[in-house]
């Protein structure tokens, strides 16, 4: 990713956590090297300039979007990791501690995700095909 608007937009819309985190990390690297460059010796500024040349320029608003997208993607996958932890013998209290929430909140989060998975999929191919089969009969 070279930092142009199209590649940043593509990363943010990709659903690929690694691409999204790269946008976030590039912003933070750029900020860090700019701070170093502003306060260092000539040698430090030269080193910072070298590193800045290799980091994609990411706007603060793009970084905020990347942050929000990363949180969304990670939270969406949390239920699966909770399932793995439970299967490995973790208690709800341990899971809650790992997440920084209560055991009840961890249990409630997992329950809500399971309920979402049980909802009918509006793009259920089998249901769509069943309608075609019904049409053949009529």
PLM feature segments, named:
Residues 41, 53-56, 78, 98-99, ...:
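Generic alpha-helix initiation/capping and coil-helix boundary signal
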Residues 81-82:
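Short alpha-helical "packing" element that flanks the helix-turn-helix/winged-helix DNA-binding module
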Residues 55-78:
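Short, Lys/Arg-enriched anionic-surface-contact patches
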Residues 1-54:
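General nucleic-acid-binding
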Residues 10, 78, 90-96:
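Short, charged low-complexity linear motifs
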Residues 28-31, 59, 121, 135:
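Short, flexible helical or helix-coil boundary motifs
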Residues 91-138:
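Short, Lys/Arg-rich amphipathic alpha-helical interaction segments
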Residues 85-87:
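Short amphipathic helical patch at the helix-1/turn junction of helix-turn-helix
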